[in-house]
Design a protein with these regions (language model features):
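Histidine-acidic metal/acid-base catalytic patches
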Residues: 1-18, 23-37, 63, 85, ...
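Glycine-rich, proline-tolerant flexible connector loops at the mouths of alpha/beta enzymes
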Residues: 40-63
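Conserved beta-strand positions in the central sheet of alpha/beta enzyme cores
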Residues: 42, 71, 100, 130, ...
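Alpha-helix termini
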Residues: 50, 79, 108, 139, ...
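Acidic/glycine-enriched edge-of-secondary-structure segments
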Residues: 10-16, 68-75
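Active-site-proximal loop/turn and secondary-structure-junction residues that shape catalytic pockets
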Residues: 18-20, 45-49, 75-78, 104-107, ...
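Charged, low-complexity surface patches
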Residues: 22, 51, 80, 111, ...
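Active-site acidic/histidine proton-transfer and metal-coordination neighborhood
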Residues: 25-31, 65-68, 74-159, 168
Length: 270
């Protein structure tokens, strides 16, 4: 395994979606992540199975392994079941500093109102509520996300940039460079093909869930994207890949492979 200090001081976290088989077992996901050598982890909140016991188990694994929780996901605005309060409480209990939110609400104002409410719930825990834009949701691009965030009067609101969704939405790196960097408390990094298999919502979802590539293995200029952010900004490595799931059925081997290849990509870009 490559040494961390050879390549970058950036904190790297394994996104929970890289091992979707463990969505209902977040404590084991933390163990797998730490065992593979990651210094930080994502946490998936499953509404059906999460309990106070889950919070204790996840927190214990985080503390025992000396890793940090970069984020917890996901709050879906527009669904009839409101997971916001429960997820924020869980994030506070395990020490996650950011919460990922997506929206299917019909207007900027509706989304902003819900974000404002979530920010008020999360503020005491020093947690940032991060709106992610995706072409197949109501908030489709960085410009959409900026319009929403303008309507939120809260210091703990942010925007989550995922390189795949940046590319698919037509958002440019120049647009990112003109923004207040404080809007981006962490970033999701990966790579991808120059074009998705198609532009329908279902095809874009498949692109996001199954077809991602390791940074530097695709056509999305992952190195340039990485260079846009100071090294104190954590990167969540969001390589959701059906081929990797098939090649590495062992979870720790998969996590270790993604880490090694990501560190190699950072070494190339330095």
């Amino acid at each position: 395994m490559l040494k961390w200090n050879m390549v970058s001081s950036r904190l790297l976290s394994l996104a929970a979606g890289v091992i979707p088989e463990l969505i209902k077992d977040p404590a084991r996901f933390v163990e797998v992540t730490a065992g593979a050598g990651w210094k930080a982890t994502g946490v998936w909140f499953d509404q059906e199975s999460w309990s106070s016991t889950t919070s204790r188990e996840v927190k214990k694994r985080i503390d025992d392994n000396g890793v940090s929780a970069v984020d917890m996901e996901v709050i879906r605005l527009g669904r009839s079941i409101d997971t916001g309060k429960a997820l924020i409480e869980a994030a506070y209990e395990v020490g996650a500093k950011n919460i990922l939110v997506v929206s299917s609400l019909h207007s900027y104002q509706e989304t902003a109102d819900q974000l404002s409410h979530l920010c008020s719930l999360a503020k005491a825990g020093d947690i940032t509520i991060c709106l992610e834009f995706m072409k197949f949701t109501s908030v489709k691009s960085l410009s959409d996300a900026l319009e929403v965030v303008k309507l939120v009067d809260a210091s703990n609101v942010g925007i989550l940039l995922d390189l795949l969704h940046v590319a698919r939405s037509g958002t440019t790196f120049k647009e990112i460079e003109t923004c207040d960097p404080n809007l981006f408390p962490y970033v999701q990094w990966c790579d991808g093909t120059a074009q998705p298999i198609g532009w329908s919502d279902s095809e874009l979802i498949t692109d996001a869930l199954d077809d991602r590539l390791i940074p530097s293995e695709g056509k999305l200029d992952a190195h340039k994207f990485e260079s846009l952010f100071d090294t104190d900004i954590p990167f969540s490595i969001e390589v959701r890949s059906k081929p990797l799931r098939e090649k590495f059925p062992d979870y720790e081997e998969r996590a270790r492979y993604v880490l090694d290849q990501t560190l190699a990509a950072l070494e190339i870009s330095d």
